[in-house]
Each structure stands twice: as C-alpha cells, then as structure tokens.
Amino acid sequence: MVVAPIPYGFGSYPADWLRSLAALRAHPFKLLIPGHGAPQHDRVYLDRLSGLIADIRSQVAPLAAAHLSYDEARKKIDLSRERRLFAGDDPWLGLWFDQYWAEPFVKMAWQEANGIPITQGEG
C-alpha cells in the first residue's frame, strides 16, 4: 500500500487505495515501515500519496465522462507537478515515476472511472 520514494501503480484500485490510506492515516502509529523505502515517523508521505491518487482521479473523471479513449485522456493528464514532488530532478526517479506510477495508475484510474473491471495478472 505504501512504497517510497515512487509508488507502484500496477493493478491498482484507486478508490479503494485512497480509502485504505485514509484508514492507515487515522491509525495511531509512531513508525510506518513501507513496502519499499525508509521508515516513516509521520504522515507526510501518506498525505503526498493520497493527494497524488486524488489528483489523478479528479483529472480522469471529467475525461471519462466526456467518453475520451484512454489514449486521448492520457494526453490531457498533467502530472508535471506531482512528478517534481516525487522525483525532483533525479532522472532515475523521474523514469520510475513515469513507468512504475504514471502509466499504469492513470490507466487504472481511467478504467475505474469508466466502470471497466481492473484485473490482476494475465488471467
């Protein structure tokens, strides 16, 4: 659920993920050990990740309502601010943000907004 510094967007369920992050945020933890990344002593990254998911969903929703195809919608999604927030100027983190987060997660958000089932794996 929490991977840092770049989250993985493959096979995600955006609305469920956002609800799960909210539940985790409400839990009175003192230390959060993410699936990848340094231990966290606060909720800063949780808030950043929740904001990222919410922003993508809010950009995708009107495009889905306008019946844009995934390819058409993807061209209209602007993640430049989020990319800077998560990757900074690091070229590797930028590449990982694009490949591991932006491409798969925007597709999952588009599928969710269009009522298309999100499946895990090949079968």
Please name every model-derived segment.
Residues 1-55, 59-62:
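Metallo-beta-lactamase
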Residues 65-123:
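C-terminal regulatory/interaction regions
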